[in-house]
Amino acid sequence: MKKAGLLFLVMIVIAVVAAGIGYWKLTGEESDTLRKIVLEECLPNQQQNQNPSPCAEVKPNAGYVVLKDLNGPLQYLLMPTYRINGTESPLLTDPSTPNFFWLAWQARDFMSKKYGQPVPDRAVSLAINSRTGRTQNHFHIHISCIRPDVREQLDNNLANISSRWLPLPGGLRGHEYLARRVTESELVQRSPFMMLAEEVPEAREHMGSYGLAMVRQSDNSFVLLATQRNLLTLNRASAEEIQDHECEILR
């Protein structure tokens, strides 16, 4: 019993330290790098010179930019043209806010252009990390390849994923996930952030503790994946963990 108690105490200490490190990372100047790129470089260059550089695309009227990430050959980021920190922002559950996940799905074409040939939809994934699972304080959705093992697991669970948020059998990458099936028409009309906030008990009050991902299934539906921070299991809710920025799935 003493050993079990000591182990539990050690886990708590590790969790607290991990949380502290995450907070420290987000309070430095480097955590504003993406915001500065968007607001001080991409947006002004588009407005003054009709050139989105260093972004790949700038859509001021639609409220977003697309930027090639330095990590990985095909990874892109979709970000707002105004200040939104992350999943904790109440703006994401405001119906007037752009449907950033749907916009990010449209932006997957940049992966194909960079690759030189079409990247199959089954190889693409979208992910946004929780407040403690991210390193940047400007909202950004990762557009990248899915890990082959995650792809296989989702394929095997196709019949187990319903139109309600339910635990995904076995979780992903050692962490618990909720999964929800959505059709394309649903996705066009309603943001995944609103689905999570309105359909999962108490999620609205704790949106910043969630990471969210989206993947297309073989039946042309989409699966939304949500994981909530749990420091006791060392889960920082970094939904980006389902992605493989080196794109092994294309080899």
UniProtKB/Swiss-Prot annotation:
Membrane topology label: Single-pass membrane protein
Chief site of localization: membrane
Keywords: Cell inner membrane, Cell membrane, Hydrolase, Lipid biosynthesis, Lipid metabolism, Membrane, Phospholipid biosynthesis, Phospholipid metabolism, Transmembrane, Transmembrane helix
Catalysed reactions, as listed in the record: a CDP-1,2-diacyl-sn-glycerol + H2O = a 1,2-diacyl-sn-glycero-3-phosphate + CMP + 2 H(+)
EC numbers: 3.6.1.26
Family the UniProt entry places it in: Belongs to the Cdh family.
Transmembrane segments: 4-24
Record localization: Cell inner membrane
Organism expressing this protein natively: Escherichia coli (strain SE11)
Any one biological process term the GO annotation gives: CDP-diacylglycerol catabolic process
Xref: SUPFAM superfamilies: HIT-like
Pathway of action: Phospholipid metabolism; CDP-diacylglycerol degradation; phosphatidate from CDP-diacylglycerol: step 1/1
Cysteines joined through disulfide linkages: none
Signal peptide start-end: none
Name of the molecule in the record: CDP-diacylglycerol pyrophosphatase
Enzyme class: hydrolase
GO annotations of cellular component type: plasma membrane
GO molecular function: CDP-diacylglycerol diphosphatase activity
